[in-house]
UniProtKB/Swiss-Prot annotation:
One of its GO terms (biological process) is neural crest cell development. There is a cross-link at residues 421, 575 (Glycyl lysine isopeptide (Lys-Gly) (interchain with G-Cter in SUMO1)). GO terms for cellular component: Cajal body; cytoplasm; fibrillar center; nucleolus; nucleoplasm; small nuclear ribonucleoprotein complex. Nucleolar protein that acts as a regulator of RNA polymerase I by connecting RNA polymerase I with enzymes responsible for ribosomal processing and modification. Required for neural crest specification: following monoubiquitination by the BCR(KBTBD8) complex, associates with TCOF1 and acts as a platform to connect RNA polymerase I with enzymes responsible for ribosomal processing and modification, leading to remodel the translational program of differentiating cells in favor of neural crest specification. The modification Omega-N-methylarginine is found at residue 686. Residues 172-188, 330-342, 431-443, 563-572 have a biased composition (Acidic residues). This is Nucleolar and coiled-body phosphoprotein 1. It is found in: Nucleus, Nucleolus; Cytoplasm. GO terms for molecular function: protein heterodimerization activity; protein kinase inhibitor activity; protein-macromolecule adaptor activity. The modification Phosphothreonine is found at residues 594, 610, 613. The modification Diphosphoserine is found at residues 89, 92. PANTHER family: NUCLEOLAR AND COILED-BODY PHOSPHOPROTEIN 1 (PTHR23216:SF1).
């Protein structure tokens, strides 16, 4: 697939694939909007579908980290062109890249300077790291690609806004695109069509555990495979969720740390080279700068901004509650606009929770935003939002988690395109409602399945949490997906809490996916957040009950990935059982315990008797009194030449220069020995004749 590849692939090459995917997914409304927005036409029915490409890529990606063509790392442009050889796979991967760089690219378009400078700087690093992270990056790109289908479904107007920047970014960031794209393409060329599709899954895997992509891939692969089986959107969501699930895990332990850690994390991901291509090129640029910032100032523009995030983390974390909105507004009007808009929307549903969570997200966002590297800020912000989300999750305030999720979404998007934020905000006002409504309606059905998966992902993510901490910041898509995941797990909880409301949370999920997919979809974020927060209010009681059931529901979702309906039914049943079955199970447990207690006394007696007998025997044994000897002298044969290690036993000792010293020192031990030896060295010691004779023992090599 890489053999045809000198044709430049553009995002529009993927439009037919996405359009077909939408139609196959029975998203006719979204498909029609997408077709109108992009002017895409139906693809040849015989051509590979996104799912085919994705499945092929998934199967190949797990087997072929080999695609990390380090030799081609520098030649990412060629690799990119090579990947263009397969329009479907490469287009999808590159579309992902460009859509993924719909986040970065828009950043690049808005930040052409940063794109050209950091990304070129990131090129070398990205190429080097891309060779190691090319798979992850390609996977990530494909995830982005699949997120884009979701986004394009939900945020088609935004997609329009995003794609022009993406194209511009392509021209301006052709280098960075080629780097990031080529890294994915390097991998994709070999398994381009399937890889394109599989990339999303593999990306999720790799991204889920950037530090340990291989491990993350299998786990995520399973979750993703299930997700994809339920529905491509659900697979996208599940991928995002899995990625995000890992980020939330990171975030759970660290809320405020996120602000401080974001830059470090961004740097760490870069170092790990687990960053996705977008993140690898941009984030590596930015993150390397953070890394260098740690070591020293970085020449590229982003670094100075990264220090700001470092400074802000401590202050902003404290300020989260009080100055959250204000800092966000003051620091980045555009990004804060989207933040504030999303926050305002969030506030109506859950004013108290939202104000706190948004503030946290905003400071983090601010910090990240202050850094010129949107990728760095994206990753750090994503991590920070994810952490607040995770934190809220642990308390299990239904409303709070959702606002945090929404905020997380808003934050990532804002970071994703700090420059794009104005655009995204415009898109928000114009198309956020439409996108969110349509995407919510369509996604409601798919996300019903995705929700359980998302929860499953969240659960699986905890194990991945540490690796992914780097992974989140490592890639924008990771961070965005993590944010999406954060949101997703919460909507899933809502779904589980309210089976009827499943469709509603699902829209939230899709909105989340959209928003995370493209920075321009912040409007969809806002709308989705609003919806989410409104839903939280209604579903809060149910959510709380479902949280108890949330685990079973997610487990069921894992088992029930077969069909969304089954998942929904299981969720509903579990919800019902949450209040009833769990208490019942507790009673059963108590009964079982009582039964155990009845039988235990006998067992205990038996056990007690046995131990009492053995200790007596052991005490009676002589071994207890004798000290333990690993080596018994009587059983070991020692060579006569080394049996005696004293000075006198050495050959040539008699009449030697050190003989007189030995006469004094052989009776001396401890500190006094060193003292005496030093006196001999410093004083006027004169022993016997100094001999050059070799008295060492030579052992035969037997």
């Amino acid at each position: 697939m890489a053999d045809t590849g000198l044709r430049r692939v553009v995002p529009s090459d993927l439009y037919p694939l996405v359009l077909r995917f939408l139609r196959d997914s029975q998203l006719s409304e979204v498909a029609s909007k997408f077709a109108k927005a992009t002017g895409a036409t139906q693809q040849d029915a015989n051509a590979s579908s996104l799912l085919d490409i994705y499945s092929f890529w998934l199967n190949r990606s797990t087997k072929a980290p080999k695609v990390k063509l380090q030799s081609n790392g520098p030649v990412t442009k060629k690799a990119k062109k090579e990947t263009s050889s397969s329009d479907s796979s490469e287009d999808s991967s590159e579309d992902e890249d460009k859509k993924a760089q719909g986040l970065p690219t828009q950043k690049a378009a808005a930040q052409v300077k940063r794109a050209s400078v950091p990304q070129h700087a990131g090129k070398a690093a990205a190429k080097a790291s891309e060779s190691s992270s090319s798979e992850e990056s390609s996977e990530e790109e494909e995830e982005d690609k699949k997120k884009k289908p979701v986004q394009q479904k939900a945020a088609k107007p935004q997609a329009k806004a995003v794609r022009p920047p993406a194209k511009k970014a392509e021209s301006s960031e052709s280098d960075s695109d080629s780097d990031s794209d080529s890294s994915s393409e390097e991998e994709t060329p070999q398994t381009q069509k399937p890889k394109a599709a599989v990339a999303a899954k593999a990306q999720t895997k790799a991204e889920a555990k950037p530090g340990t992509p291989a491990k993350a891939q299998p786990k995520v692969a399973n979750g993703k495979a299930a997700a994809s089986s339920s529905s491509s959107s659900s697979s996208d969501d599940s991928e995002e969720e899995k990625k995000a699930a890992a980020p939330p895990k990171k975030t759970v332990p660290k809320k405020q740390v996120v602000a401080k850690a974001p830059v470090k994390v961004a740097a760490a991901p870069t170092q790990k080279s687990s960053s996705s291509e977008d993140s690898s090129s941009e984030e590596e640029e930015g993150q390397r700068q953070p890394m260098k910032k740690k070591a020293g100032p970085y020449s590229s523009v982003p670094p100075p901004s990264v220090p700001l995030p470092k400074k802000s983390p401590g202050t902003q974390a404290p300020k989260k509650a009080a100055a959250q909105t204000q800092p966000a507004d003051s620091s980045d009007d555009s990004s804060d606009d989207s933040d504030s808009s999303s926050e305002e929307e969030k506030k109506p549903p859950a004013k108290t929770v939202v104000s706190k969570t948004p503030a946290k997200a905003a400071p983090v966002k601010k910090k990240a935003e202050s850094s010129s590297d949107s990728s760095d800020s994206d990753s750090s912000e994503d991590e920070a939002p994810a952490k607040p989300v995770s934190t809220t999750k642990s308390p299990k305030p239904a409303v709070t988690p959702k606002p945090s999720a929404a905020k997380a979404v808003t934050t990532p998007k804002q970071p994703a395109g700090s420059n794009q934020k104005p655009q995204s905000r415009k898109a928000d006002s114009s198309s956020s409602e439409e996108e969110s409504s349509s995407s919510e309606e369509e996604e409601a059905s798919k996300k019903s399945a995705t929700t359980p998966k998302a929860k499953v992902t969240a659960k699986a993510a905890p194990a991945k949490q540490a690796p992914q901490a780097a992974g989140d910041s490592s890639s924008d898509s990771d961070s965005s997906s993590s944010e999406e995941e954060e949101k997703t797990p919460k909507p899933p909880a809502k779904k589980k809490a309210a089976g009827g409301a499943v469709s509603t949370p699902a829209p939230g999920k899709k909105a989340e996916a959209k928003s995370s997919s493209s920075s321009s979809s912040s409007s969809s974020e806002d709308s989705s957040e609003e919806e989410k927060k409104k839903k939280p209010k209604a579903t809060t009681p149910k959510i709380q009950a479902s949280k108890a059931n949330g685990t079973p529901a997610s487990l069921n979702g894992k088992a029930a990935k077969e069909s969304e309906e089954e998942e929904e039914e299981e969720e509903t049943e579990e919800k019902k059982k949450a209040a009833g079955t769990k208490p019942g199970s507790g009673k059963k447990r108590k009964q079982n315990e009582t039964a155990d207690e009845a039988t235990t006394p006998q067992a205990k007696k038996v056990k007690l008797e046995t131990p009492n007998t053995f200790p007596k025997r052991k005490k009676g044994e002589r071994r207890a009194s004798s000290p333990f000897r690993r080596v018994r002298e009587e059983e070991i044969e020692v060579d006569s030449r080394v049996a005696d290690n004293s000075f006198d036993a050495k050959r040539g000792a008699a009449g030697d220069w050190g003989e007189r010293a030995n006469q004094v020192l052989k009776f001396t031990k401890g500190k006094s020995f060193r003292h005496e030896k030093t006196k001999k060295k410093r004083g006027s010691y004169r022993g016997g004749s100094i001999s050059v004779q070799v008295n060492s023992v030579k052992f035969d090599s037997e």
